[in-house]
Amino acid sequence: CSRICPYDAINNIYEDKSRMYAGSFRNGRMVYGRLAPGEENSGKLVNMVRQEAKREAENNQLAVTIIDGPPGIGCPVISAITGVDHVIIVTEPSVSGLHDLKRTIEITSKFNLKSWVIINKSDINSNISELIKTYCKNTRIDILAELPFDSQMVEAMVQCKSIIEWLPDSTISQKLIHAFNRITNGS
């Protein structure tokens, strides 16, 4: 409308609504970004969040910083893994999940990053789960955990808790604790 209105009665106003936030939560500090729908520069926002998280970690003498990167394989993923020591790739057994996993492993290999894989909802498609495991074996990527679908994960989120807080003795909680211990021990 703004391009064809003969009276210039309509103007587009471009405003970047993407924001970075930092604050405390029940387990420590968190830095995160919120990208408004349709906004560009998501890689730039991820970089800003990563840099602020690094400052927070240094200021609070934290040895481990976890960056939860975006899904997919675009620029925001590259921005999220830049300067990290390790990458945990969480995938699901779907055609697109397998495709993105392969591309992400290619990227992490180019950066010479130690990578692990977690297969989320590993039981929803056993054929693709097997393809994921075979691909990881062939590329020498360790699978940290295979997490089956569990409706208790949803219930934990409804209760605003992690699954480990909600059901600490559940199979998924135990698998996640084991994965965390492997990561922090570097094995």
Model region roles, listed by residue range:
Residues 12-41, 45-48:
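FAD-binding core/adjacent interface of flavoenzyme oxidoreductases
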Residues 1-16:
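Iron-sulfur cluster-binding cysteine motifs and their immediate structural context
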Residues 107-187:
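C-terminal lobe/tail of nucleotide-utilizing enzymes
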Residues 68-74, 94-102:
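A general structural motif
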Residues 74-95:
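Inter-motif core of Ras-like GTPase G domains
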Residues 67, 89, 117-119:
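Structural beta-sheet core signal
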Residues 56, 101, 117:
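Residues forming the flavin
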Residues 34-37, 41, 48-77:
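Switch II (G3) loop of P-loop NTPases
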